[in-house]
Design a protein with these regions (language model features):
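Cleavable N-terminal export/targeting peptides
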Residues: 1-33
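Solvent-exposed loop/turn segments connecting transmembrane beta-strands
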Residues: 44-52, 110, 131-137, 171-177
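Residues on the lipid-exposed face of transmembrane beta-strands in outer-membrane beta-barrel proteins
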Residues: 55-63, 75-77, 100-108, 120-124, ...
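Flexible, solvent-exposed loop segments that connect beta-strands
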Residues: 76-94, 129-134, 172-175
């Protein structure tokens, strides 16, 4: 049993090292032409036995743009707080996660300075402990939702979005995923 646990932790460590190396290589090759910061508070929804809220911070950089679609790469930091109940047992589910992120955005102008966006993003997160309770110390966060962006100068914009999030480790066993929804505030600056 102990060797299984060590093997799992070694696989997670190797995967984390690979993903980190890949992210660092991309960051070193990219010229930072813009930065976008998104902060959000998402409240639990849809599952009766999972009461987990997320405080998320996403840092994105535009990597590619074509015909109204933009691809972004970045980093996600999350602070999840709450609990799960399974078969009447209350388990705290508090954790901090960090990992690489990618986002696809479809943007259309509504007026000269106002744009309507649809976003889809995914993050691979390593948590400081098994999360949610009885889960694993790693997982994925998927987000989708509309966003309004106000470009108040040539180089700066504010945005407000409404996001639906699904967090899960993607495994068939030990996969206590959860959903959350809420508002996301963003700021973008072009250099």
């Amino acid at each position: 049993m102990k060797s299984n646990v060590c093997s799992i932790h070694m696989k997670i460590l190797c995967l984390t090292a690979f993903v980190s190396f890949f992210a660092i290589q991309i960051a070193c090759q990219a010229m930072a032409k813009n930065v976008e910061v998104q902060a959000e508070y998402l409240q639990h929804r849809m599952f009766d036995d999972r009461f987990i809220n997320n405080y998320n911070l996403h840092l994105f950089q535009k990597a590619h743009e074509h015909a109204g679609l933009t691809l972004h790469r970045g980093l996600t930091v999350t602070r999840a707080h709450g609990y799960t109940t399974e078969k009447g047992v209350h388990r705290d589910s508090n954790a901090v996660g960090l990992g690489p992120a990618a986002m696809i955005r479809w943007e259309r102008p509504l007026s000269e300075k106002l744009y309507g966006d649809l976003e889809l993003s995914g993050s691979f997160l390593i948590y400081n402990k098994a999360f949610p309770a009885q889960g694993r110390p790693w997982g994925f966060m998927w987000r989708v939702g509309p966003r309004l962006t106000w470009k108040y100068t040539k180089n700066n914009s504010f945005s407000l979005g409404y996001m639906l999030s699904h967090s899960s480790n993607g495994m068939k066993n030990k996969n206590p995923g959860h959903h959350a929804v809420g508002f996301s505030l963003g700021f973008n600056h072009n250099f």
